[in-house]
């Protein structure tokens, strides 16, 4: 029997006024277990953020056909049989929302989270930014075959000097970057500090924002030859979106997606110290609203009779690229 992990409240995190020193969650320790049990539902209390407005339109309620999936079993990656309930407990999940044919089948919340909670989405953010880049390309606002530096001359001399926009979107750039999440002194640590996700350490002499960070990455290998998962590629895509629209990514998400789908809650993006938004990992949103976005892609960009995205964009977002 897998035990349900303790909640942030049961652990006493940020309880009391003020919370005891050993129960305080800060920007310095938010990633350290168990502090992330509290932090991932309270990111805007720890760092600068930008609002993603749902607008003033009505909520598009999800049709429901409820079924409890807790006892549904499957074979896990290690070959053991697990139930959905066991998987959720072992992964310290805060929520589960399942749609089938556009209907809400199951919805479960843990650790104090509920339908209105805005949760840190980490790299799910990339799906929104990539989709927007493809949509703007379909409208002729972005040329996927153009060089990145045609839009962002600040990146001349960097890894993106001779990379195309498509290389960045597809994460096929040849770049010297090690995506290892140790948050010590490596590339991801530098990215976390520059993006505003992590505080600036005492004595830090490195980049203090994304504008300073991105030009420092150098080329390694050839572009377009292989998939190389590099979060800064999505930061570049977000920068291009902001450059061609004249608006921050949060506003483009609001206008193009959030206000179009009848979302239940506003969302928000983490931003750095000069207002550049964390396009690679900065989204915080409610679980049902993430499900709505997924359904939009499955419906080839159509939502309640409105073509929110070009059909080819929805299809491309659900297709494996080789």
Spans of features found by a protein language model:
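Extended ligand-binding groove/face enriched in aromatic
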Residues: 92, 120, 158-210, 214
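Short, charged, amphipathic alpha-helices and their helix-cap/turn boundaries
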Residues: 103-108, 147-150, 184-223, 248-266
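Active-site SXXK
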Residues: 102, 120-145, 168, 237-241, ...
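Penicillin-binding protein/beta-lactamase superfamily catalytic region
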Residues: 205-208, 212-218, 225-227, 245, ...
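Non-transmembrane alpha-helical segments in soluble domains
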Residues: 85-88, 134, 149, 166-169, ...
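Active-site helix/loop module of the DD-peptidase/beta-lactamase fold
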Residues: 138-180, 216, 244-281, 285
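N-terminal leader/targeting segments and the immediately adjacent pre-domain N-terminus
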Residues: 1-113, 142, 170, 174, ...
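Soluble non-cytosolic domains of exported or imported proteins
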Residues: 78, 93, 119, 123, ...
């Amino acid at each position: 029997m897998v035990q349900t992990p303790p909640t942030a409240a049961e652990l006493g995190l940020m309880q009391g006024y003020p919370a005891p020193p050993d129960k305080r969650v800060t920007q310095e320790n938010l990633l350290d277990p168990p502090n992330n049990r509290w932090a991932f539902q309270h990111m805007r209390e720890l760092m600068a953020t930008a609002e993603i407005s749902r607008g003033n339109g009505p909520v598009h309620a999800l049709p429901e056909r409820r079924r409890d999936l807790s006892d549904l079993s499957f074979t896990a990656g290690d070959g053991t049989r697990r139930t959905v309930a066991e998987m959720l407990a072992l992964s310290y999940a805060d929520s589960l929302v399942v749609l089938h044919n556009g209907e809400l089948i199951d919805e479960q919340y843990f650790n104090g989270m509920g339908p209105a909670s805005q949760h840190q989405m980490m790299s799910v953010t990339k799906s929104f930014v990539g989709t927007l880049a493809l949509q703007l390309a379909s409208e002729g606002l972005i040329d996927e075959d153009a060089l990145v530096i045609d839009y962002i001359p600040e990146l001349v001399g960097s890894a993106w000097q001779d990379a195309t926009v498509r290389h960045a979107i597809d994460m096929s750039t040849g770049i010297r970057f090690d995506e290892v999440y140790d948050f010590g002194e490596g590339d991801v640590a530098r990215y976390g500090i520059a993006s505003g996700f992590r505080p600036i350490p005492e004595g830090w002499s490195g980049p203090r924002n994304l504008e300073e960070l991105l030009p420092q990455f150098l080329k390694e290998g050839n572009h377009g030859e292989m998939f190389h998962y590099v979060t800064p590629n999505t930061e570049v895509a977000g920068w291009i979106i902001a450059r061609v629209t004249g608006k921050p990514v949060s506003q483009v998400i609001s206008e193009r997606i959030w206000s179009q789908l009848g979302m239940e809650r506003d969302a928000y993006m983490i931003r750095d110290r000069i207002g550049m938004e964390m396009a690679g990992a900065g989204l915080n949103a409610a679980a049902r609203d993430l499900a709505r976005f997924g359904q939009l892609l499955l419906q080839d960009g159509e939502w309640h009779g409105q073509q929110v995205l070009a059909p080819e964009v929805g299809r491309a977002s659900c297709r494996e690229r080789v």
